[in-house]
Amino acid sequence: MSKEKIIGIDLGTTNSVVSVMEGGDPVVIQNSEGARTTPSIVAFTAKGETLIGQFAKNQAITNAVNTIRSAKRFIGRRLNECESEMKHVSYKVIRSGNEGVKFETSAGEFTPQEISARVLMKMKQTAEDYLGQKVTKAVITVPAYFNDEQRQATKDAGRIAGLEVERIINEPTAAALAYGFDKKNVNSKIAVYDLGGGTFDISILELADGVFEVKSTNGDTHLGGDDFDMAIMEWMISEFKNQTGIDISADKNTVQRLKEAAEKAKIELSGTMSTQINLPFITADASGPKHLDMTLTRAKFDQLTKSLVDRTRIPCENALRDAGLKASDINEVILVGGSIRIPAVQELVKQVFGKEPNKSVNPDEVVAIGAAIQGGVLAGEVSDVLLLDVTPLSLGIETLGGVMTKLIERNTTIPTKKSQVFSTAADNQSAVSIHVLQGEREMASANRTLGRFDLIGIPPAPRGVPQIEVTFDIDANGIVHVSAKDLGTGKEQKIRIESSSGLSEDEIQKMVKDAEAHAAADKAQREVIEAKNELDTLTYSLEKTVNEAGDKIGANEKQLATDEIKRAREAIESNDKARIESAKASISKIATDIASKVYSQSAPGAEQAAAGGPNGGAGSNDQGNSTNNGEKVVDADYTVVDDEKK
């Protein structure tokens, strides 16, 4: 029996493609209908049948409420994050569990993972028919800006389809792999501009001697060909209402007809200057049947979709900046996805990068080909290719004052692992709560919560003494694992991040944009919080020193310290940075004077108390928080657990 193949699948919003390595080269496999692409559509008929692909698409107009398309736009998202999609689909979208999404049909309720699994099953069967053997392993592509939940949901869809997902790889990276597969001796910098049916990605890569290294990635998880179709649909609905006074947007079957007509018009306008949209018997009123007959010019189409095209510009500029490159440094721009055929899109690419885009690859098939090549690498069929991908957004945890402390920066090569030592923020704290975040903002509340977990059973100790090592581990699929370990006791808690949903429309891109727009305000707020934390630590240490000093210091010195501690606490409450800095200077001087006096009067063996003076206290991000090996200790957010109530 021949060695089991690892197939490559491009699970697209609009269409899906399957490919496999044969004789050292990738081959795109035709489906049972003789097509190399399969519509990512699933339908449930009145007879109890499940139709997938072209057969499902063919009956969509007459069975709109039971025909699910663009499921990828819902996968890994909360219901309230899908409001714009829900307005433009012909099927019913309902709540699943706490916050998830399901599709309601006559055959039952289905999650986006289940619908995607049906499409993957079609791809799996297509490969098995071609290879003449069972297929159980696959590499599946996802948009580069898919978050952890969406990647896991895609893996779940594969598992439902009976596939062991050997690797999740980013679509632009897969495209670069396909483009450079036969150019291993060429050293070049390329940009992959990927505008698909539901998502947009831009990745900057460097190709050198068979190594494909992603330098940066950016994008918009809710921008694609569907949005161009919707723009045409909304124009048709508005024009028809102006002409007849009838709103045709409420009927699901009519919406499906409009969707197909809009998609057809969009495609035609890539090759012609105008197109005729003719939908007879679109509706009726008391005077009889009504027909929709309109002419859409390319100029009007460009006007309707200009804002959509422009939304791809800033991600391109950000990706270049993050890669440390200028547009002139890019040797080739590769176009991927069906929507890149739109002339206005190609013109924007030319403007941004200053060169004609490379059109040598098939934009519909190149991603699946790259997935097959990666499958060949994992199966041992391809040995001279190395793929180095990145994580698109920064990861970290919330620390004292509501600050996000980043452990892994965006565009870090994966797989990767990073640890940092944190400490407690209160005396005798027996538990810490780890709040895992994703995003670029300085404050935790402005970033995306990926999950929370607790590490309990920490032995009683003064704040700052326990050492809690938090470790982030991102695997080659871009999926996040987090652990927290008490270095004193060895107790450890591990989780794989499993949030209830994915990100909202434009949310990941919005994180980066908001970070840039609010950079100054975020920085100022963070500086105030860090100054407050430092002053709090100094105050705590001084108070402890005074209490332990006893009669080693005089009454006047004690009163001076007490007054300064009161003034420091008032400064902490004020949020006035200048006042906080002034209090820090004053309390540092007093603390140093008292510590010196106590030290000079101490008996041998008492130095440790003095050493715990102004800079020895725990809880600050920047002062006196070092482990024996020099690792930085940062204050962690915490939850106090009452042992008597357990």
Curated annotation (Swiss-Prot):
| Covalent S-S links between cysteines | none
Q: Report the gene name.
A: dnaK
Which positions bear Phosphothreonine?
Answer: 199
- Print the keywords alphabetically: ATP-binding, Chaperone, Nucleotide-binding, Phosphoprotein, Stress response
CDD domains registered for this protein in UniProt: ASKHA_NBD_HSP70_DnaK-like
Q: Where is this region: Disordered?
A: 598-646
What protein family does this chain belong to?
Belongs to the heat shock protein 70 family.
Q: What is this protein called?
A: Chaperone protein DnaK
What is the protein's known function? Acts as a chaperone.
Q: What is the lineage of its organism?
A: Bacteria, Pseudomonadati, Spirochaetota, Spirochaetia, Leptospirales
Q: Name one GO molecular function term.
A: ATP binding
Q: Where is the composition biased (Low complexity)?
A: 601-612
Q: Which SUPFAM superfamilies match?
A: Actin-like ATPase domain (SSF53067), Heat shock protein 70kD (HSP70), C-terminal subdomain (SSF100934), Heat shock protein 70kD (HSP70), peptide-binding domain (SSF100920)
Question: What induces its synthesis?
Answer: By stress conditions e.g. heat shock.
**InterPro entries membership:** ATPase_NBD (IPR043129), Chaperone_DnaK (IPR012725), Heat_shock_70_CS (IPR018181), HSP70_C_sf (IPR029048), HSP70_peptide-bd_sf (IPR029047), Hsp_70_fam (IPR013126)
Organism of this sequence: Leptospira interrogans serogroup Icterohaemorrhagiae serovar copenhageni (strain Fiocruz L1-130)
